[in-house]
Curated annotation (Swiss-Prot):
Protein family: Belongs to the AdoMet synthase family.
Binding site for Mg(2+): 8
Chain positions recorded as ATP binding sites: 14, 166-168, 234-237, 245, 251-252, 268, 272, 276
EC annotation from Swiss-Prot or TrEMBL: 2.5.1.6
Job description of the protein: Catalyzes the formation of S-adenosylmethionine from methionine and ATP. The reaction comprises two steps that are both catalyzed by the same enzyme: formation of S-adenosylmethionine (AdoMet) and triphosphate, and subsequent hydrolysis of the triphosphate.
Top-rank lineage group of the source organism: Eukaryota
Gene Ontology annotations of biological process type: one-carbon metabolic process; S-adenosylmethionine biosynthetic process
Free-text remark on how the cofactor is bound: Binds 2 divalent ions per subunit. The metal ions interact primarily with the substrate. Can utilize magnesium, manganese or cobalt (in vitro).
Catalytic reactions on record: L-methionine + ATP + H2O = S-adenosyl-L-methionine + phosphate + diphosphate
Protein name: S-adenosylmethionine synthase
Subcellular locations according to the entry: Cytoplasm
Residues at which L-methionine binds: 55, 98, 245, 276
Amino acid sequence: MGFLFTSESVNEGHPDKLADQISDGILDACLAQDPDSKVACETATKTNMVMVFGEITTKAKVDYEAVVRQVCRDVGFISDETGLDGNKCRVLVELHDQSPDIGQGVHGMGTKSDEDIGAGDQGHMFGYATDETPELMPLTHVLATKLGHRLTVVRKDGTCPWVLPDGKTQVTIEYENEGGAMVPKRVHTILISTQHIEGVTNEKIAEDLMNEVIKKVVPEKYLDADTIFHLNPSGRFVIGGPHGDAGLTGRKIIIDTYGGWGAHGGGAFSGKDPTKVDRSGAYISRQAAKSVVAAGLARRCLFQISYAIGVAEPLSVHVDTYGTGKIPDSEILAKVKAAFDFRPGMMGKALDLKRGGNKRYQTTAAYGHFGRDEDLDIFTWEKVVPL
């Protein structure tokens, strides 16, 4: 019996994603100078304004305003027409040291070894993998994300000069369940809403989106005469970016992960250093789940881990292969526990998470944190661990 499932994505010019990239741009700047920086940086943006706020303890000397403006320019917010001008917008900075109460409990104010560093907070994180794509990611999520990325490519390379930074995509796929494994059959619906300049016709928008975006991304085998296309269905999307909607860090956590598949513990990633297990725990969980599927132990895998603040060892670890495991889940879990060290300090070391700079974390903040095999030097958690 087939069923429909939908995932969405947003472009790097969506205001929430801009906020994520700014928070991670600041994290990069801190870690580049001081790998032991403790960063919890949030960003809010609205018309002609960006505010960064939170807690940062670092030896780095960072011009936070300069970082904010550069990220805005990187994305393409360089004029009022785009929704924000990174060269002249107001930038508010409210950043203070990390609470010493947290510091003494987590890292002993810098005195604890990697083996003893505790989790930066309580929480539970998930990792997910599925054999339906080469990336071992859900196809709905992969296609929605790649459509959004392609929109940015055609904007920046001049193929579609009418495209502006803000945009959203959504893909619905018809699946069949084969003994717990997800098998995509066809694309049911594609939705694209992209910000555009004044004066371009809806006919031109639809033509370019079909020929330069959809046909360049979606494999022909998934499209048929019954596939539905909604291309800028509102009819007008000139006002966008932070001028159209306020943006906040951490509001696109499903887009950042698996597009609604698997599960999510609720914690966002951007602006957080590796002692924050919301981020490092989710990264190692993805690596664990991916390694299970890559090893052929299961066609589909969900991995969960949980922590207490200040405690190094996880409280629980769990594997669910949805009935697709070649061996019992308990045996798979034993293999995972033997191959991974889930203490926060050791996860950071194994995945080289203290290394920032060169837009490492800023790159993760748009177009998904997982399934990014194109650069394993950045996305170290996508490397498969032998089990």
